[in-house]
Regions:
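Hydrophobic residues at beta-strand termini and immediately following loops
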Residues: 27, 76-77, 168
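Conserved core of the sugar-phosphate nucleotidyltransferase
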Residues: 119-194
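N-terminal glycine-rich phosphate-binding loop and ensuing alpha1 helix
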Residues: 2-59
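Residue-level signal for inorganic ion chemistry
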Residues: 6, 33, 90, 114, ...
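Short aromatic/hydrophobic "clamp" motif used to bind/position activated sugar donors
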Residues: 110
Length: 194
């Protein structure tokens, strides 16, 4: 089973949106999150979608799902106080859904994706699933096109080669058993943001 876990619990503070969180901003007649959800909803290998959302915006999201005929969303849950907590809550909801379908965590692949990032392709989703099937996890990366500067502990600066540098993107995909175990271990160790 392949489940997209979409986190959309942010309030858009960095973007300074006052009227609504950025995932619900209108873009050509649709909230941004709907474009993201359509990508996963239309993908033939995605079985279900879980969304972690700002609790007060859940009714609005439910209305938009009906309006734009997004059919694979099986759970909408209140997001957490941080992106990390929203992801964990989404993973727990994905686990609950998979278990309700008698599918184990070992058999379940989750694709963790940000609700405000609709600019991915069907091929990216397919590649993530295939790579998890092959090696157990996959983080979408693109080649770095700008110069990166890394500050060392002694304040010295290092400029790594662009040819050797990549930018991590979403989705980030895993076998559910691995990522939920990592989250639970980190929480047990008192690490809330990792």
């Amino acid at each position: 089973m392949n489940i997209a876990v979409i986190f959309a619990g942010g309030s858009g503070l960095r973007m300074h949106t006052k009227s609504r969180p950025k995932q619900f901003l209108d873009l050509n007649g649709k909230p941004i999150i709907i474009y993201t959800l359509e990508l996963f909803d239309n993908h033939p290998n995605i079985d279900a979608i879980v969304v972690a959302c700002i609790e007060s915006w859940i009714p609005f999201l439910e209305k938009q799902l009906r309006k734009f005929e997004i059919n694979k969303v099986v759970k909408i849950i209140p997001g957490g106080k941080s992106g990390q907590e929203s992801i964990y809550k989404g993973l727990c909801a994905a686990e609950e859904y998979a278990q309700s379908k008698s599918v184990s965590n070992e058999e379940t692949i989750v694709l963790i994706h940000d609700g405000v990032r609709p600019l991915i392709t069907e091929e990216t989703i397919t590649d993530n699933i295939k790579k998890v099937e092959e090696v157990g996890s996959c983080i979408t990366c693109i080649p770095a096109t700008e110069t990166l500067i890394v500050k060392q502990a002694d304040d010295a600066l290092e400029i790594p080669s662009r040819a050797d540098s990549f930018i991590a993107r979403a989705p980030q995909s895993f076998r559910l058993i691995d990522i939920i175990t990592a989250h639970r271990r980190s929480l047990a160790e008192g690490k809330a943001d990792f």
